[in-house]
Amino acid sequence: MSPSRPLSFSPWRLCALLAAAVLAGCASEPTPPSPTVEEAAAIAKQPRAMQPRKPADMKSRIVRFLPRQVQDKPGWANDVVTALSTQGLTVNDHNVCSVLAVAEQEATYQADPVVPGLGKIAWKEINARAAKLLIPEFVVRTALSIKSPTGKSYAARIDALRTEREMSEIFEDMIGAVPMGKQLFGNLNPVRTGGPMQVSVAFAEANARGYPYPVKESIRHEVFTRRGGIWFGTKHIFGYPADYPDTLYRFADFNAGWYASRNAAFQAAVSRVSGKPLALDGDLVRYDSDLPGKTELAVHSIASRVNMSKQAIHQSLLKGDSADFAKTDLYHRVFTLADRQAGKRQPRAVLPGIQLKSPKITRNLTTAWFAKRVDDREQACVRKMATIR
């Protein structure tokens, strides 16, 4: 099993020592300072996959690792190393393989992956929105038969759709130029994820601080590039503190949202103590209503045992999307009760039981399935990288 986060020594010295990757176009790589005797000894004791590598060496190893069919292997290698180094992460096999495993699972190392039947998916979205406004499909088709900025009609472009980037661009054009486009979609582009790691556009826009590349048009557009998709995907995997026993849970969080695995474990503990069955989905409060959800109601039923008011419970649960939740009295008191009742320490991380839903998904898949698949790929990558010098 892989550790959940890179080991560290002095934070500032470690950044200077390990983060030596530079952006494409730089003439040369800076020489990192030599480690102290103590740091060198500590590094030597780490598992090989956790030991830092020189950025230039890692790039050449990534090029040799990537499958034959991958286009522009040096570009991939540079983007991965840049993503790690500019986010203060150690350039080592474990971190590189975590990023590559997600990229392989999500898009098989394609910067702009082809989605089968995307034109039909787009029409379904358009017609569904039109139906809500009582607009007949033939009226929509007629409206979209006009020429778009590319010279082709919107309808023809939709029929020929192959990638989410193309789909996003069409909706941008429609919203900006077609009166009905504004009526159907307002200013909200319905394409929410994309790129080589299928990152949420909303996530990228909320976590753009420190992005090392020039933003040509918008963060949305950057998500659909290889460099942007990899940078924001890396941010999604490692960009938050989480005391997980294994990276498996970070992979689950990549799919279900930050701290979903921690929150699912809390829900399991609440269910044990309260005796009330709960869906282990990682959602501690309802985001669609001010009314308490099932998790909050279950905690209410043990309010006297955790010695907290309903208001205090609610305020604690609102911290469920941050690291601070694990510092709350509610978190510690619930787990104290659960550990005591079980006679042993209960897991602080559990794979969320979430059904994956998307027009692109045609099988019965779950977050746990996704996390385990990525974890298998990461471990296979680490084993292969160990043979590449």
Residue ranges of model-derived segments:
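Cell-wall glycan-active module
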Residues: 2-3, 9, 25-389
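Bacterial N-terminal signal peptides
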Residues: 13-24
